[in-house]
Every structure is written in C-alpha cells, then in structure tokens.
Amino acid sequence: MTLVTCALGPDSAGTLLTRLLGRGRQSIDAAIYEVGPSYRWALVRAAERGLDVRLVVDAHRSDGNAATARELSAAGAECRIAGVGTAAAHGKLLIIDSTVAVGTGNLIWRDAPRDRHLRLPPAGTPLAGTREWWVTATGSSRLDRAAADAFSAHWRTATAPPDAWASAPRLAAPAIGVPMPQVPPRVLCTTSRRVGLVVGGAAVREALAAMATAARRRLLGTVPYVRPESAPVRDLIERMTRASSRGVACALLLGGVPDPSNVEHLVSLPFAVRRMDPSRSTSGHAKGLVADGAVLISSANWSAMGLSGNWEVALRVEHAGAAAYYAAAWRRDWETAIPIEV
C-alpha cells in the first residue's frame, strides 16, 4: 500500500517539507532548481546529523544557490550543478529516506513558507506565499526505484559547483497574498501502480497530452503563464480545445497577468481562461492538471523549454481523492480569479 500526501502552498506544503527534512534518518537526495537560506539550514543540519545528503541545483546563483552549495559542502554534503547551457535543471524532486516528494515550487520562502511552530492548518497562522502544489508518496518500491534512477542519472550528468556562478535574469518577484481558507494536507491510500513519476520536459508534455486526449469529464489546468507561440504549448491548447468540443469541461487558470501578446489568443479560446490576482488571493506558481479522476503535479512551465529540453519532474496520481483535493484548491483559486479580457 502506498501512502500519498497531497499538500498546497502556502497553506501547508512548506511546513510538511520542513517536517520531512527534519525527520530524515539516512539520506536526502534533492534536485531543486533553487534552494535559498530558508531551507539551506535544514539540509546543512541533516548533513551535520550524519545523513548522506546530495543536492543538485540549477547553475545560477539567484536565491542563494551558490551559498547553499558552499555551505552544504562545508558541512560534509555533496553538491553539484546542472542546467548549464540553454536547458534548465528546473525539477523539484526530494527523496528523503523512503519518501518521494514532487512539487511545483522551489525551496525558498516565497514558494514554501512554513509555520514557525510547524503547525498545520487550521492550527497555524495563515501564511503568505505563491500558490503551489506538492505531493509525497511513501511505500512504493516501484516509485522509489524510479525516483532513485532519475536522481542518479541527473547526478551523473551534473558537475561540481564552479568558482564563478552564472547570473540568472533578474525577474520581478510576483506579489503574494494570503489565500483563504488555508487547508491541511490530505493523506490517501492507493496502490503503487496508480502513482507514476515523469522525468523530462518532453515526457511531461506527453503525459499532459495523453491526459487531455483521454479526458471525458473535466480538464482543469493551472500554470503561471502560457507561451502559445511555442509548438508544445500550442499542441496542449489544441488538445484542450478538442476536448472542449466533445463536451469535456475545460478551463485554464494562469498564475498572473498574461503577456499582452498572448491575450487575444487566450480570449479567443472556446474554454474559459482566468488569471489569479494577489489582491484577491495570491499569485499562482503551481503547474498542474486535473483530468477526470487523475492529477499531474509538475515542475514544468508551459513554455518551449519547459515542455521539451528542461530537466523537469512530475508525479501522476490516479486517485479520485487526490484529484478532488487539487480540484477543490483549483476551484477556490478560480472563484477569486479575474477573466482574461482584451
């Protein structure tokens, strides 16, 4: 039996991840695009407690990657970098002992705030942060092997941290709010075959496409933004359009204001598109798709590289309870979102 825990950020995901990191007893393998000071200490402390800690971060220093690599190495952990060149190491994968965690956000405070006493809703204080989706799974030897193989392959292609780190483009941090209500994680039991790891941007695209093609009842998507001028994104939008034409309830929720060049295209779609507003809820950074009774939680943005060359990770859960949990979160965000208008 596999235990699956569904969690949302900012509600509880950061608290859940901090608890997991603190309870590790043997090893932590982490492949995360960005790790900042608000989580660096947890990995350093784990290494100092004697755990085998390995971390792969993207090859840019923003949000503390350079300092994280330096301090982890000093604590006896191993750290490498990936994503040199045009493709980014954009995945969010944690393997803590026998628990696999996959999510949409980085290990930085904006993406993963936590309650100071590690309390879960409704006991804790409501938190401000970007909307994120996370999922953990324990008790699946099949998933454990897949995650270990994916991390090992990623580790082998990664390299030692450089003396001089590359600078990432300085992007304005999104405004954030306190979405309400904030809800606790949900723990579900399922079978190992209903939980599947997806590795690589192209593989994530194929998984999304298959879900859109097979959907018979609903397709509820959420992404920070879309780039419909890119072929992989255009294909997904066309699949949602075809699903809508056969009676599937389709809708797409963006995490913020879309690029002006894409607005006219989004408005013309035969299904509804809205954007999140931090003054009403928060900004969205989740990348997920609920299709009937299944859900895919992914690190991949709907962009050319996010759905092709980037190192991305997703977890598909075929369970009505998991789909209902994320669909309810999607619905709460949808109700406070603003329709896209020209």
Give a label for each model feature.
Residues 1-81, 87, 95-342:
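Charged, low-complexity intrinsically disordered terminal segments
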